[in-house]
Amino acid sequence: AFTELCDDMSNMQTALGKLRVAGSGGQYMLLLDDIWRLSGSCVSLMSQIPSSHIDTAELNSFVVRIGDYARALSKKALNDEERTAEDEEQLTALYDSCARISRELNDRLSIGDVPTAAVTNEGYYESAYAQDVKQSDDIDKFPTLIYDGPFSESSEKREAKGLGTDEIDRETARATAEKLTGTDRMEDAGETEGTIASWDFTATDEQGRETGISIAKRGGKIVWFMGSAAGGENQMPDEATRERMKQAALEWLGKAGFDDMHATYAQYYSGAGVINFAATKDDIILYNDLVKVWVDIETNEVIGADARNYLFSHTEREMPTPSVNPGEAEAKVSVNLEIESRELALIPITVETERLCYEFKGRCGEDEYIVYIDAQTGAEQQIFVIINTENGQLTA
């Protein structure tokens, strides 16, 4: 219950943060529903924690009031009432308080040192809209932490669209494997059947480090390969090194037959950087068509790649013409978001559908967000919060 409570408080903090930059409409209502449900889950979890470990009275009161406030805002939205300046101040106060509690829970819950002082200020709770709300622990919807950037792990695909048509033999696959790994000592490692059938190989270098690689039988593109980094610290390198690594990855992608790729997000650990690249067409980012590339921080060599998302998704697309112009789309973004960049992107909605959206990146206070506005309807499609760590960026 301790771990689940920490997770739910963190997820509630994330949802409150997104709510500050959400416009009206579907995303706003979904976030309010998330917050209410997470509030109910936290109340249920606290009932399972011995009172000696946590002052449940104060924390319970705080969490219940967050849920109450979310339901009150939902009722306002359903009545077509606009959010007021008082609402904005209330949301910011709740977010800040939730963030403090979430940090302290993760740091101190295990030893029973909980920061109840952070939740006792009645100014955080006073609301003319608070209503009695029936709590529910039937949680069927949570904000999901998405590593490597938005849409990096999209839903399981039904068929591989980007393989090509021509079948290749093992020796042709071996030549490709040797070219892409820089070794001529590839040994047979069997073959893989399934949606992406492949010829598999391994190699061992002079230092005893192994490399495994799979080449698609149909089309001959790399499916994945993985070697080992020379070593190094688990931290993000300086900007010049990151740029050098990105260029090395782009050069390797071109050699592997992946053209017009755009670097999105990166993580750095175990002496390597893992950089996400999305395909582009007509300057539109295709978030479904992703290739991850591992680059050794010390040697700047590409030591791994995973092209499965790309092979499942990449196909010729007819891009729709936006019905909403950039200015109209920007007007749909909350005034609380200080916009820093704008792109066009094709984002996954379901396993089989994508939507052309304007991608707005910006800040609300100290926090960074990405907001997607549908380029055809002007509806708010998705919101992500960017989480900066010593190893790179995550989104949630």
Features from the language model and the residues they span:
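Long, terminal "pre-/pro-" and other extracytoplasmic accessory regions
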Residues: A1-A396
